[in-house]
Regions:
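Short, solvent-exposed mixed-charge patches
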Residues: 130-131
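Substrate-binding/catalytic cleft of secreted carbohydrate-active enzymes
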Residues: 1-127
Length: 131
């Protein structure tokens, strides 16, 4: 058995504390997997990494960096899976400028272009593989 959770820290709600200071109390001895995390960005859109509403690659990359910092504080963490690899069509995404019928949480755009957060996750997984 494993425990899997979806947690969108920094996207749907702000961080309650600095990511590096987030303490997780895991009350089970089972392996824990973060089965979904991330946030949306339009490929090629630049903006302030501190402004969630910018939908920028810089904000998405910061969000991933923050989550990676938090992962170090999670007991029993055995794996993480960003939501999602590619941007995809979604009929329930109504923001006319940034979504227009697309879920933009992908690490890769719908045209196959790698967003800045893709490189962060590649480096994260490479580091984990080598440890």
């Amino acid at each position: 058995d494993v425990v899997a959770i979806n947690k969108y820290m920094g996207w749907y709600h702000p961080w309650p504390v600095e990511p590096k200071d987030a303490i997780w109390e895991v009350v089970t001895d089972k392996p824990l997997i973060i089965s979904e995390f991330g946030g949306e960005a339009l490929y090629g859109q630049s903006g302030d990494e501190n402004v969630v509403s910018s939908w920028s690659e810089e904000y998405q990359a910061r969000l991933y960096r923050d989550n990676i910092r938090m992962f170090d504080n999670i007991p029993n963490l055995r794996g993480v899976s960003p939501w999602i690899l590619f941007d995809f069509r979604s009929p329930f995404r109504f923001h006319p400028t940034n979504q227009d019928g697309w879920n933009r949480k992908g690490l890769i755009s719908d045209q196959g272009m790698r967003k800045k957060a893709w490189y962060l996750m590649r480096d994260y997984y490479m580091k984990k593989r080598n440890n």
